From Swiss-Prot:
The gene is guaA. Pfam families: GATase, GMP_synt_C, tRNA_Me_trans. It comes from the Bacteria. Keywords: ATP-binding, Glutamine amidotransferase, GMP biosynthesis, Ligase, Nucleotide-binding, Purine biosynthesis. HAMAP family: GMP_synthase. The active site is at C86 (nucleophile), H172, E174. Pathway: Purine metabolism; GMP biosynthesis; GMP from XMP (L-Gln route): step 1/1. It catalyses: XMP + L-glutamine + ATP + H2O = GMP + L-glutamate + AMP + diphosphate + 2 H(+). The keyword NAD does not apply. This is GMP synthase [glutamine-hydrolyzing]. It comes from Staphylococcus aureus (strain JH9). The keyword Amino-acid biosynthesis does not apply. GO terms for molecular function: ATP binding; GMP synthase activity.
Amino acid sequence: MEMAKEQELILVLDFGSQYNQLITRRIREMGVYSELHDHEISIEEIKKMNPKGIILSGGPNSVYEEGSFTIDPEIYNLGIPVLGICYGMQLTTKLLGGKVERANEREYGKAIINAKSDELFAGLPAEQTVWMSHSDKVIEIPEGFEVIADSPSTDYAAIEDKKRRIYGVQFHPEVRHTEYGNDLLNNFVRRVCDCKGQWTMENFIEIEIEKIRQRVGDRRVLCAMSGGVDSSVVAVLLHKAIGDQLTCIFVDHGLLRKGEGDMVMEQFGEGFNMNIIRVNAKDRFMNKLKGVSDPEQKRKIIGNEFVYVFDDEASKLKGVDFLAQGTLYTDVIESGTKTAQTIKSHHNVGGLPEDMEFELIEPINTLFKDEVRKLGIELGIPEHLVWRQPFPGPGLGIRVLGEITEDKLEIVRESDAILRQVIREEGLEREIWQYFTVLPNIQSVGVMGDYRTYDHTVGIRAVTSIDGMTSDFARIDWEVLQKISSRIVNEVDHVNRVVYDITSKPPSTIEWE
């Protein structure tokens, strides 16, 4: 991954821990740039990256399992500080001549350690709570190492070779359950690796703009804009770098939220004076979706049609050499490490044609989602746009269960607008990770005035989450839910019932389709 030479880097090597991205994020929160790479990275690549420190992540394997993950032991001879976490500590012990064995019982959960070190534990109390998760245990440390923390269950909760600046901890400092975990990581990054913490969004913008200008020169760039946070930030960053050399194509497939298409044109076309081509393709999409009720088929049709529409418009433009995409660092990690696992396929509108002869520009592919939001604020994008709700590529097409019709889309569009308005008025928009309405393929009997009705049911989905991988339903106050329900049944035609989804993820997903 491209990186400014003067930028401090902490390299995290991935051994399959569910917390590996968290390590990277914790370090970035300290103002120090960090990247996650596969454990099989070569010594030559590491030297080229010139990291200030290396962290070996945890992992689910035993160091003695056949085919278990390992590293080139030469890493320990580079003169770069190394911190091994759980599996990383066990692997370090084994590779440097110590002994590791299977524990009688897997140690999982909170534990109390007694620490002593003027480096890793500097300024921290001796007794502290940590989070353990391991099935192997160290029984003999390598030559040159000493114990710097123990616990009731192990004599080797943390070890160090101070001369070579190699450290190991048998717990996870990156998780919130570890009482002083952030402080320990900060000690490693600042005290041991001597990082100054100068990585900011302001610096990121300066570096990226210079990289974009050098690469693009006087050529032109095309950007597929959806109005979502990622594509919006990419477009504004590129526009700041190259101005009118950027052209954005906004495909309006007719499956957007209320007023969304006009908002994109107003905020970005007029507000940022960007060159945006709006393609009204609603009829084209609706014709393709007619009679289709299977969710996977709907998603595929929407994705494919988006590609065809974009391709048609792109072919009308001459002299375009680059295509910009809002790829995030999580996408890079999932596609770039052997140990990564995709929990769920995402709702991104399908990939663009392979035969499109463009060079790719992905200016935010080193950032996590929360960092992209910070970047957006730094670029001057209004907060209400930066903090917009995540919206799937197929749009309302997967929030109308079953066949999509204009009438059903209007019900979802209007009910969703009411939900968002009330949530905003109640000041809950930052407390709830995601909230939206869905239209199940359900009708029920009701009474409105003196008349019997047989109309649609609207479902409300609102969840709290940290990263979207797991979530819980939001505990919205009953009076607020009543207000939302009352407004929907009174203001949206053909709705006589509102229900609230109280399912967590897992077992359900956040979206209904």
